[in-house]
Amino acid sequence: MPGTASLLDAMHAFATGRADAVVGFAQQPIEMRARKIGQVIVNTTTDRPWSQYFCCMLGANREFVQRYPVTTKRALRAILKAADLCDSEPLKVARFLSDKLYEPRYQVGAEVVKSLPYNRWREANPEDTIRFHALRLHEVGMIKSTPQKLIAQGTDWRFLNELKKELKA
């Protein structure tokens, strides 16, 4: 919403009737539900077609990856191990988030961590996500490249595929 500086401002604008809707990340819908404000229209974690694709992906500069492949793989490994920890021990992760004040409200953090599909990286194909979003962007004229061209020229799944084998559950 124009004139809002933060998600809190956007939520306040919605709660006071100055906005008809608000886009929230994981915490905001939980907070608004607790305050009995509005209702969720689309939940990309559970509603199709969005729920079938990754909400977040890791991007890297091609030159950096070529110059520092070991560092790149280590960073990706750390992120995937963190995702596994979120999946296997959500309450421990929520406590960490609360202790470090990343999400100071333990209950909100716990609900968020438990609600997100952190283990999806093991089974889902990230290429499907790129294809899905590229098709939408291509359809509305925001990108000129085809999904196939974007995937061919802009993705490299080697590290991910290697780590899927290395980090078997």
Labelled PLM ranges:
Residues V23, I41, Q107, T146-P147:
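A generic structural-conservation signal
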Residues Q66-S145:
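Secondary-structure end/capping motifs
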Residues E31-M32, P49-S51, S115-L116, Q153-F159:
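Short secondary-structure boundary/hinge segments and terminal tails
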Residues M1-S6:
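Short beta-strand-to-loop elements that line the ligand-binding cleft
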Residues H138-A169:
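Conserved C-terminal helix/tail region of periplasmic/extracytoplasmic solute-binding proteins
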Residues V42, A60, E103, W121-P126, ...:
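Short alpha-helix boundary/capping motifs
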Residues V42-T44, P117, N125, K149-L150:
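Short, solvent-exposed coil/turn linker segments
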Residues D9-K100:
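Pocket-lining segment of extracytoplasmic ligand-binding domains
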